[in-house]
Regions:
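C-terminal accessory helical subdomains adjacent to catalytic cores in phosphodiester-
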Residues: 2-17, 22-161, 174
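Generic detector of low-complexity/intrinsically disordered segments
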Residues: 81, 89, 110, 161-162, ...
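Low-complexity, intrinsically disordered short peptide segments enriched in small/polar/basic residues
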Residues: 115, 137, 153, 165-167, ...
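Mixed-charge, Lys/Arg-enriched low-complexity segments
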Residues: 153-164, 206-224
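Generic short N-terminal amphipathic or hydrophobic helices
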Residues: 155, 169, 173, 187-188, ...
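Amphipathic, interaction-prone secondary-structure segments
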Residues: 165-198
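Intrinsically disordered, low-complexity regulatory segments enriched in Ser/Thr/Pro
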Residues: 188-218
Length: 224
């Protein structure tokens, strides 16, 4: 992270994500305190943390549950039987993720399952545990929403250029994984904003339009 942040802004990656399983961190209070301190430092520099507790497998599990339910797995080993019940012979390896057909078809390529996992993840993150309660969550949806905001901006710019028959000088200004403002000459034209799973386009005059973030925009869309 430090190496990337030391680069000049024009040479730096568009976004820096840190994807982390927190099960081993939380076990050690001293280690977790150091992590929290570093997290606050890097968040101020624009790094987006993608935490999962206990581990990334809770994200995979959300793809395959029939309905949302809060769970309290403390470690990967505790969660493992649940993930193996829906993904037999599951392995926490790059080879498995790349080669296993069941994983590919139900996790990587299944749009309906992905939208369900996003919904369940947001519900899990909204829950506030009581003191010392173990609760599971994943923030992988933040990365998906971030890239979907960028995709929608790219579509807006392309469609405007096509409609006006000239290049359009607009720029994105990203506040977080939830919000992207479409800018022209430092003025906001409109803002793309997530509220839960819903994406809206809000214009400065107050007009608001719903956007389906799973489908490309086209010329028939009201915001164009």
């Amino acid at each position: 992270i430090d190496k990337e942040l030391r680069k000049k802004p024009q040479e730096r990656a568009d976004a820096i994500f840190l994807v982390i399983d927190t099960d081993t961190l939380i076990k050690n209070k001293a280690q977790y305190a150091i992590y929290q301190e570093a997290k606050e430092k890097y968040k101020k520099q624009g790094v987006i943390f993608i935490e999962s507790h206990p581990c990334i497998e809770i994200w995979f599990l959300y793809h395959l549950l029939n309905k949302f339910a809060r769970t309290n797995f403390e470690t990967y080993e505790a969660l493992r039987p649940a993930i193996e019940s829906v993904l037999p012979k599951y392995e926490k390896t790059a080879r498995y993720y790349q080669k296993n057909s069941a994983f590919r078809d139900s996790i990587l390529k299944n749009q309906a399952n992905r939208e369900k996992a996003i919904d369940f993840s947001i519900k899990a993150c909204k829950y506030e545990p009581i003191e010392d309660e173990i609760t599971n969550y994943t923030e992988v949806f933040k990365a998906i929403h971030f890239f979907r905001l960028l995709q929608k901006f790219a579509e807006i710019r392309l469609l405007l250029a096509e409609k006006l028959r000239s290049n359009v000088a607009i720029q994105p200004s990203i506040d977080s994984h939830k919000t992207l403002s479409v800018m022209q000459n430092e003025n906001i034209i409109c803002t793309l904003k997530y509220t839960g799973t819903k994406l809206k386009c809000i214009f400065t005059d107050g007009q608001t339009f719903d956007i389906d973030d799973t489908k490309p925009l086209d010329m028939t869309n009201s915001i164009i």
